């Protein structure tokens, strides 16, 4: 599946559709799919990349606790961030590509339950994935929200000029 949205709402819809079709995500990778010098209409937003999502039919195993799935997601997302970062991926697409890895863990089970017995939603899962990816970039740095944003930005983009659309996308997706 080629997916070009960065918003959590769009990802929630995609993941719910995949899981609802008894499929599971096996991987997700950012790909540059747009030309940098293309023309844009008035007030149009520019998309720089898409995420390729691979899926396969899945057999789900009963239920699992959120505590165990959370640990598995944090481990898998950290590994994915490190691998993609080493390959040169940066920007909000690096964080977004980790959504697929989180869903692959979550999708192994019919339900994932919190300690109070309520089910974990895909939206909550994606928030966990975003946090795990961002924490992997910060490698344990503990600071206030603005400092974490700044350090995360530097990790992914370095110092220099940045297109407004890139900064806006990171602000929406990156924290």
Where are these regions (language model features)?
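S-adenosyl-L-methionine-dependent nucleic acid methyltransferase catalytic domains
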Residues: 1-175
């Amino acid at each position: 599946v080629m997916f070009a949205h960065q918003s959590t709402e769009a990802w929630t819809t995609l993941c719910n559709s995949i899981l609802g079709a008894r499929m599971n995500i096996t991987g997700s990778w950012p790909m540059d799919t747009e030309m940098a010098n293309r023309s844009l209409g008035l007030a149009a937003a520019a998309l720089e990349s898409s995420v390729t999502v691979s899926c396969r039919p899945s057999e789900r195993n009963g239920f699992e606790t959120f505590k165990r799935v959370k640990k598995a997601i944090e481990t898998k997302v950290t590994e994915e961030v490190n691998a993609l970062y080493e390959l040169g991926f940066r920007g909000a697409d690096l964080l977004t590509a980790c959504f697929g890895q989180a869903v692959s863990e979550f999708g192994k089970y019919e339900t994932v339950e919190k300690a109070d017995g309520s089910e974990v939603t895909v939206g909550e899962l994606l928030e966990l994935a975003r946090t795990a990816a961002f924490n992997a970039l910060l490698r344990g740095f503990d600071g206030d929200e603005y400092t974490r944003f700044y350090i995360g930005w530097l990790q992914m983009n370095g110092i220099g000029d940045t297109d407004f659309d890139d900064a806006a996308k990171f602000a929406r997706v990156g924290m």
